[in-house]
């Protein structure tokens, strides 16, 4: 099983059967001859790698998240998103994500073809940040900033990524409200 990237293109209703090519870290030499095929990339890919991949014109891109030691009953399929900055620069594609151990099995067994079914609808939503400033006493022009994101990270339970960071800076804020700081402190919770 796979999950589609948020903002992925859709396949036709009857799916898309493609030749599969493992392109490792998507270096230029690995991307030769992949036009019209599905490419399996090591892990997730950044802006530059996405650009290289798109330049090679594959019909679909497959990445993976997690670790080969992840236990099925303790982890979800990672939900990934292709950022607008990527697609604005390099275009859209069909993008899916699978678990690392499934990617290992696909490569180990020498899979040659994949059939993908992706139904995706683009939506826009708004995210908000929460910012609190505590003005310092005698060194108010010096600023110390704390930040954490409070959006959902679906691959984890949220306790570590990043609820713990959000709670820690909330407790720091509580402390410094009761004990005014010498320097100005900024506390920032980011929605995404």
Regions found by a protein language model. Give the residues of each.
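Intrinsic low-complexity, polar/charged intrinsically disordered segments
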Residues: 101-103, 169
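Non-catalytic positions within long, well-ordered alpha-helices that form the structural scaffold/packing
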Residues: 53-57
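Second-shell loop/turn segments in exported
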Residues: 7, 11, 22, 39-44, ...
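Protein/peptide-recognition domains central to ubiquitin and immune signaling
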Residues: 1, 63-66, 70-82
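Structural recognition of the beta-strand scaffold that forms the well-ordered cores
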Residues: 20-22, 38-41, 60-63, 95-97, ...
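Noncatalytic luminal/extracellular "stalk/propeptide" segments of secretory-pathway proteins
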Residues: 1-38
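Short beta-strand-to-loop junctions in surface cap/lid or active-site-entrance loops
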Residues: 10, 26-28, 131-140
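Alpha-helical metal-binding/catalytic segments enriched in His/Glu/Asp
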Residues: 43, 130, 142, 146-192
